[in-house]
């Protein structure tokens, strides 16, 4: 008998080759870990085969048991066949494996719901009748509408009963509306209001207080009856009186209607009028009662009194060449010689005065807006002071004045920074500018209407300052716009005019409009001469001489005439043109012929070449010549005098 030998079978140490690169490098596969090796071995076990083997073992065991029983009966009892020694261990492992499988299934079912899905058994859908649904919804909407209508009727009935029991609006509601627009405070048992502009920066000494009380029924009835009677007397109809539960008591000096009237007079005739008031503010609050109108009128009176008081104080303090006069409620200041500015405070306590409501024909809205704006700026300066820089600097100097040291301002610049205009000085300056501008407009319109040739057009700048306006004047000839267009710009200031011509010349004029008229007439004469020279060049005529100020002839009080002398292309014809502007434009045209027909040689002058000096000039009747305007006539004249040879 051969002796058995133990042979160990092990996996090769060398790993398997996973990939061979192009350069021959071999990439090996890493050896599996213990867990991977265990999983690989477990995957090779066939548990179903194991179960079948167990069944076969059980059947064989049963057969052996039966055979043993038979043998025990026949054979001796002291002998017993032995079973497989690991049978009990195997059975316990099998039971444990079964329990683990059951536990795994239970955990899988509990964790993943897909193992147990309850699918309901589909049933046939019931037949839906659409008309039944429509009737059901209609019935539900009808019941809801009935509930809402019933509630609305109840609210309407309650409101009607409440309105019938109360003749006037609630006092607290009216007080709330009053508090939205006016400052109120409670002093003891009294409600006091404030009409002044102190919160806006006003320093007027009048307190401007009013008292708010609760109106009694008898007072309401009396006021409504008187208001209705007055309305019937004026209009003939009886509107419904507006009831109120508030009563406003204003001081006596603030009752009524007040406005400031500014008039520019010349020889007791009004040139310009502006009225300052704040009426019409009650239209912004349609729900307000009679108290709103009363408070608006009272605040307007306070505003006008404050403005007039400030103007009167400045009129007394200013040192003008012609002193301002303050008499009663009237301030008189001199704008220009013979022209005065009258500022009046009109205050009427009677309710039937309609002077303020009458329309004014020559009302200047710009001046009215300026009066409002100037007082608002005065209030703004009282409350808004420039911040000091640095923080330790004194409060008061402006930022520009603080930079005077680092910027090295001189004495003149420092004096200019300290200058400021008062309200009255600004109003006087604006009134002077308005008067000067109107006179300039009148002069330009008059010249444009009187002078038909050439045409004068004025374009006023829409964006102007209150003390300076700008107008551009264009002088053109109809049909000859391409030859020449004379343009000049005039700056209208308070007491002077500044003219800037096209060639850059600047001329300063006073407020006398005769200087402006003379300047425009001079520009017209220059335009005619320069445009004629341009036309002569186009027609090949020669310009022999040109003079802007002709020094011969009669002396003119408003300036000398302009002239030019033209020669034909063959130099056989001469044209002399003279344009005068006193008192209106006057054009004279003279012609001469060369050689002269009246030349006769004598003993002293024997050469025939002396006849080309030209003959005497003859004046033409310019008004009888054919043509639409001056340049058209001159074009026809030069064309007819041009020789063909």
UniProtKB/Swiss-Prot annotation:
One of its GO terms (molecular function) is transcription coregulator activity. The keyword Oxidoreductase does not apply. Keywords: Activator, Nucleus, Transcription, Transcription regulation. InterPro entries: Mediator_Med17 (IPR019313). Coiled coil: none annotated. Disulfide bonds: none annotated. GO terms for biological process: regulation of transcription by RNA polymerase II. Signal peptide: none annotated. Transmembrane segments: none annotated. The keyword Nucleus applies. GO terms for cellular component: core mediator complex; mediator complex. It is found in: Nucleus. Component of the Mediator complex, a coactivator involved in the regulated transcription of nearly all RNA polymerase II-dependent genes. Mediator functions as a bridge to convey information from gene-specific regulatory proteins to the basal RNA polymerase II transcription machinery. Mediator is recruited to promoters by direct interactions with regulatory proteins and serves as a scaffold for the assembly of a functional preinitiation complex with RNA polymerase II and the general transcription factors. Belongs to the Mediator complex subunit 17 family. Component of the Mediator complex. This is Mediator of RNA polymerase II transcription subunit 17. It comes from Aedes aegypti (Yellowfever mosquito). The gene is MED17.
